[in-house]
Amino acid sequence: MTIKILPPQLANQIAAGEVVERPASVVKELIENSLDAGATHIQIEIENGGANLIRIRDNGIGIAKDELHLALARHATSKIASLDDLEMILSLGFRGEALASISSVSRLTLTSRTAQQNEAWQVYAQGRDMETSITPASHPIGTTVEVANLFFNTPARRKFLRTDKTEFAHIDEVIRRIALAKPQVAFTLTHNNKLIHRYKSAVTNEQKIKRIATICGNDFMQNALHIDWKHNDLHLSGWVIQPQFARHQNDLNYCYINGRMVRDKVITHAIRQAYSEYLNNEQYPAFVLFIDLNPNEVDVNVHPTKHEVRFHQARLIHDFIYQGMTNALTSEQTNIPIQSEQSNPTKVAEPQGIWNLTTHNKGNRATAGKNIFAQQPKDYDKKSSQFKPHFTANYSEVTPKKAVQKAYAELLVTHEEKTIASSTLPHQFTHNATYISEQKNVLHALALIENKALLLQQNQQYFLLSIQALQHFNIRLQLQQSNIAQQTLLIPILLRLNKQQYQSWQQQALFFQQSGFDFTENSAQHRITLNRLPICLRTQNIQKIILHLLDQPHEKYTIFLTALCSQLEFPSLSTFSEAVNLLTKTEQQFSTQHQPEFQSLLVKIEWDHYLDKLQ
């Protein structure tokens, strides 16, 4: 078969396979067009689950007569004009494929009128390559799109449609998702001439909350926590459910990026990680989250349905969302009231940048959205950014390099009985510790027991060393160094304290400083902001640890340090080399004064009881 260009109608039907999955896909694309046209009231009429008729009517700016024939052409759009526009998508639609794809698999009628025209005009297409004719019509300012007999010319696609009830349920869900993102727009939904939903325009905060309660349920709003978290050009807002009211189905999660509903693994993982210590595998969080960021930092041109996005700095977005979620969940647990801006006009805002308001004068794009984001500072270099993740899932210490693992392997020796392989710590790693430097008193690491303890041998004595105790001891040693390695947080952590916690903070501020923490304090608002933390604690739930320390004041630094280490959580070690690596790292920080504390961690194994059983 020779290579040839596909006929336009066939090409459109192939494109429709990606854009038009089911009637709900048509509804989504048409409503997004209405929103981009600046509509404030959208009517959606459905018949037989959308298979027979989908009618979307809006009061947007309309389409001029001489542009109607272009509206149904492929890759024709008023929303972008250059590559620069593509890199900063402000509208919901931009590909110029929706109407062409829909018209190729249905009988489509488009009627529109602009404010500059005295009469409306109508164009019709019915799934085949033909010249469209424009005829006069009666219509108010705005646009109406009728999609009849969906998939009438592709029987295989129509065969895969589900029942009318199921297809309408998908349409209803699409409208719910859009209505949450656009509270200022009124929506009316009917099915088979029966009114299903009427969402009135919501302008005030009370009206917006009422719309969310209408869509998500009163139970959600009554048990939800409000989020308003900012950092430079990043802004996270919305509502998240309290952990104790988690759901058993993953059916109430709505996430939007710059007003666009999305499904993204980075966001999902950050949210799930924030809830990880509260929920089990059979529980799911519920949330309505709005993420605003510089359009240059997110690529929405990933898939024709525009559900998927790609972040240029995924780790930054992940940690920003995680910290915002964790802050909200932790604040609720400490009974910190969430006040509105009106009730607390002098409140101190979270660290944030100055947003620059600019608009575009490109016809339809002016109604599609505004660029509310300032340009990145010139001295900001993504590639040379010093940012490193300080909250990660399934974190484990860096595994030894192959050369180190080889060195460990060479240290494995076999006893005369050839029953137990032992590993001796290299001399260059052990010269500081008295318990190892003594001749003939060398500790041998023999094995990792159930991933919980190291089996050690010293002459004819055997000991168990708890991995968890060793991990805590390792951190304790690092926090007692004269120069504690610190990591500057790209997103400072803001903590709101109650009166008792703030008094505790004043008593223990020096202890935090000794441990490598760097805070700025706002005494008037009882707030502290963590700017730097010990690098050894970068994977910990640091907000939880700090609040725990403030809930229980400590008079001495040693007691404070013990309480801090008791709150640490570590991943389990799964290999012998990881355990030996941890022991080596701990030993490198040793001094003579630490020997008694280390010796207290060793549990001597008494063999007499077991040997007696062998007789």
Curated annotation (Swiss-Prot):
Molecular function GO labels: ATP binding; ATP hydrolysis activity; ATP-dependent DNA damage sensor activity; mismatched DNA binding
Homology family: Belongs to the DNA mismatch repair MutL/HexB family.
Keywords carried by this UniProt record: DNA damage, DNA repair
Disulfide-linked positions: none
InterPro entries registered for this protein in UniProt: DNA_mismatch_repair_CS, DNA_mismatch_repair_MutL, DNA_mismatch_S5_2-like, HATPase_C_sf, MutL/Mlh/PMS, MutL/Mlh/Pms-like, MutL_C, MutL_C_dimsub
Top-rank taxon: Bacteria
Organism: Histophilus somni (strain 129Pt) (Haemophilus somnus)
One GO CC term, this protein: mismatch repair complex
Function: This protein is involved in the repair of mismatches in DNA. It is required for dam-dependent methyl-directed DNA mismatch repair. May act as a 'molecular matchmaker', a protein that promotes the formation of a stable complex between two or more DNA-binding proteins in an ATP-dependent manner without itself being part of a final effector complex.
UniProt name for this protein: DNA mismatch repair protein MutL
SMART domains linked to this entry: DNA_mis_repair, MutL_C
SUPFAM superfamilies named in the record: ATPase domain of HSP90 chaperone/DNA topoisomerase II/histidine kinase (SSF55874), DNA mismatch repair protein MutL (SSF118116), Ribosomal protein S5 domain 2-like (SSF54211)
Gene: mutL
GO biological process terms on file: mismatch repair
